[in-house]
Amino acid sequence: MVVEANKKELICSFCSKKQHEVKKLIAGPAVFICDECIDLCMDIMKEENKVALKQITSSIPTPQKICTILNDYIVGQDQAKKILAVAVYNHYKRLEYIQSGNNEVELNKSNILLIGPTGSGKTLLAQTLAKILDVPFSMADATSLTEAGYVGEDVENILLRLLIAAEFNIAKAQKGIIYIDEVDKIARKSENPSITRDVSGEGVQQALLKIMEGTVASVPPQGGRKHPQQDFVQLDTSNILFICGGAFMGIDSIITARTNNSSIGFAANININREKNNSEILQALEIEDLTKFGLIPEFIGRLPIVTTLDELDKEALITILTKPKNAIVKQYQKQFELDDAELIIENSALEAIAEKALAKKTGARGLRSILEHLLLDSMYKVAELKKHRVTITKEVVNGLVEPIMTSLISTKSNKKQPVLEYIPA
């Protein structure tokens, strides 16, 4: 409520100092605030930022410890884990260095680009890193983004998701991680600069440049376009770590064409008879390949750390099914246990499931849908029957027979079967 001294002189709504006692008095909707109160607010916010950062940086595990934790949840991808662990560790150590006030050497932010086939673990790597570091994490799909003014999501909505994840704690959000998936889908349509509008390709890359590099962005707390009169939240993106991921289908042919052109004369005959797989080809990735694919040089420049993920083979998929802490088979066995039932999946069945996922080219992402389809009828029945054991064999996976259901009450031994560990033949 605005209070006036002697019906004339305005006063600060917070400290009650009169207008002539302060240097500035700033008016707002039905309130006034003086320059001294603004300075006090700024000091409080700076102190809160220091506390928030100290909580994050004081508990940063070393790169080796980060890798050890990642190994509990993610199978394979050792090189990608190592690169990510070092990058994330250095990023948060950089924040600690900046907060200390030491400006002797300016440390730049290093965002990350993950390249790998569908279901190779790009999203899971980013999610697990955020969980390890206990920082706000948000994920966005690049395919839904468009330039401002066109139908689709504005890039500022990515920052809004991070704010929501941080419960609108701005200081905490400014130290978070943003994962932008399907970034290969915003590649421009040709290698040459676009003459006409490319609102979902090159236009989105241009829009992402500033927030990825570091800027104070105006974030609409209620979403962008439906509430034009809302007050905006100012969010500094300078210390937000951006991780971009994509399958980049077809980039292997760009790499192959480049490497073949570079091999002439006698060098062309070396390894000509050895067919390289997709993972080996990606190891030879260069910046120029990304440019030819359709990423603009400025966008690539904001992603100095580039790492590739290997395509998962049959053994890796079986390990994903059984080994990690949150392995898919363990999850389904726990669900059956909640219904007082047991689930047994034979080794031959695990192999058949992995082969199906490979045939569908869905990687680890396809394993859950295959199991869900196999176990649907069993889960439907055991909820009523209770005290039953469901066994999945290779024949069940191949659709030749139904899952085998046996009553635990009628069997001589009611001992719970241990979780099966896959042992290759």
Curated annotation (Swiss-Prot):
Keywords: ATP-binding, Chaperone, Metal-binding, Nucleotide-binding, Zinc. GO terms for cellular component: HslUV protease complex. ATP binds at P117, T118, G119, S120, G121, K122, T123, L124. One of its GO terms (molecular function) is ATP hydrolysis activity. Residues 1-53 form the ClpX-type ZB domain. Pfam families: AAA_2, ClpB_D2-small, zf-C4_ClpX. It comes from the Bacteria. One of its GO terms (biological process) is proteolysis involved in protein catabolic process. Zn(2+) binds at C12, C15, C34, C37. ATP-dependent specificity component of the Clp protease. It directs the protease to specific substrates. Can perform chaperone functions in the absence of ClpP. Component of the ClpX-ClpP complex. Forms a hexameric ring that, in the presence of ATP, binds to fourteen ClpP subunits assembled into a disk-like structure with a central cavity, resembling the structure of eukaryotic proteasomes. Belongs to the ClpX chaperone family. This is ATP-dependent Clp protease ATP-binding subunit ClpX. It comes from Rickettsia canadensis (strain McKiel). The gene is clpX.
